[in-house]
Amino acid sequence: FKLGSFLKKAWKSKLAKKLRAKGKEMLKDYAKGLLEGGSEEVPGQ
């Protein structure tokens, strides 16, 4: 049993695709919030 091959199979599964899509959306929203909220707090921007 190799963990690497198991992770690859899990990563390619449909569930993983949904999770990755959700993760990307969450990262985008998080980055957007950081940029919008951070620009007010950081002086000189």
Curated annotation (Swiss-Prot):
Expressed by the venom gland. GO terms for cellular component: extracellular region; membrane; other organism cell membrane. GO terms for molecular function: toxin activity. Belongs to the non-disulfide-bridged peptide (NDBP) superfamily. Long chain multifunctional peptide (group 2) family. Keywords: Antibiotic, Antimicrobial, Cytolysis, Fungicide, Hemolysis, Ion transport, Membrane, Secreted, Target cell membrane, Target membrane, Toxin, Transmembrane, Transport. This is Parabutoporin. It is found in: Secreted; Target cell membrane. The keyword Transport applies. GO terms for biological process: defense response to bacterium; defense response to fungus; killing of cells of another organism; monoatomic ion transport. Monomer and homodimer.
